[in-house]
Amino acid sequence: VRGISVGVYQSSLPPEIAYMLQYTGASVVLAEDQEQVDKLYEIRSEIPHVRYVIYEDEKGMRGYKDPWLLSFAEVLERGREHRRKHPDAVERLLLEASPEEVCHLSSTSGTTGRPKAAMLRHRNLIHMGVALQEVDPLLPTDDYLSFLPLAWIGEQMMSVAMALTGGFAVNFPEEVETALQDLKEIGPHVMFSPPRVWEGIQSQVWVRISESPRFNRFVYERLLKVGYRAAEYRMRGRPMPLGLRLAYWLADQV
């Protein structure tokens, strides 16, 4: 629909949200749940340009009777009705769009001052995805687990730009707290995050291993060595010896 998106972190405080909405002139806000909606109510007088707040999770929202609020389900129904009346509207907007149009505002970290918004065009995002595909190609059969905020440019790069150019499936955890369990169930081919996230995951894994029975620790340590050896061959682009291929296959079954 030729809109421009901008991300705000879930952990942002009301004054930080107010600044970002004022700075970008946002007219519609998509909020996850009651907690985020309440933050917006705190700053409502400061953001008169916001016409609607769309909330996804309806839990706890029954008592909110305000035309300012729309449930995501209601927005979908309005979209279906509009589609019935104007079946070619979306296609017309797509044809009118230009690769040079701004489609996303990516905020800086704000560590040295208030965050600034970098303007990204459609061409910027697609070029980013194409360039990544040339360096580290992914296949349409691959699964990617998105568990970091879309307000971060790294997640925009993977879940939007690279997914559009590579065509792989983007999976999301049910909740932030269940990300590790969901990771095990989904078994993604690729993940992306800054080092501190990997360090946190590694720490949780090591704690669970240290608390497991002695036999489990023994098996884990042996299979970890197999994984390291296999990774070395893969990263160098060399074929694994038959014995290592067999050991890696067995480790994968475990």
Where do the PLM segments sit?
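Conserved S/T- and glycine-rich ATP-binding loop of Class I adenylate-forming
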Residues: 29, 102, 108-111, 144, ...
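A short hydrophobic/small-residue beta-strand
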Residues: 5, 28, 144, 170-171
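Conserved pre-ATP/AMP-binding loop-to-beta segment of ANL
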Residues: 69-107, 114, 137-143
